[in-house]
Amino acid sequence: MNQEQLNEYFAHKWKSNLSQYFYCGWNLIDNICDDEWVLDVGCGPNLFKGKIKNLIGIDPAYDEADYKVTIEEFKTEQKFDVAFCLGSLNFGSHDKIISEISCVVNLLKPDARIYWRSNPGRKDHRHKDCKQIDFFPWTFEHHKEFSKQFGFECVDLRWDSNHRIYAEWCRTT
């Protein structure tokens, strides 16, 4: 699926349900301080908007996003304390994932965190068109490798509900 097809799928066939996740759902709000700026990458219908004080949501498929763009298209001088990548950097090849992570990392402050929900390649959405999506097969090892590659430490890594991987990456100066 190309980006246009992914946008169509996520805007019209997939439904967000943060309540089904323990670590990488609504509980993430408790990890954010009032003065921190959060970039929600692939925010979908921007469900954290209004619940996190300083939040910018980007998503190429949803009008509810603050910016309707991909992570590669998003440009700003602002640097963020935290990024949410909750099911958004899950599509395409190893090289595409690396490129997208690089875009996220370049938008972060030196002392930053990234919270992840990663799909280990499961085509288990409730819509038949899901079978056509090129899911990247995330593993715990990918999180360890990529976090180190980008100067982060993977400080939390575990299975969350619905067969998804929860990870927290931290970078300190």
What do these predicted ranges mean?
Residues 1-74, 113-173:
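Class I (Rossmann-like) S-adenosyl-L-methionine-dependent methyltransferase catalytic domain
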Residues 84:
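A conserved beta-strand element that flanks and buttresses the S-adenosyl-L-methionine
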Residues 87-91:
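Short catalytic micro-motifs in class I SAM-dependent methyltransferases
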Residues 93-95:
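Short N-terminal helix/helix-N-cap motif within the alpha/beta-hydrolase-1
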Residues 98-110:
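A short glycine-rich, Lys/Arg-flanked "PGG" loop and its adjoining helix->strand segment in the class I
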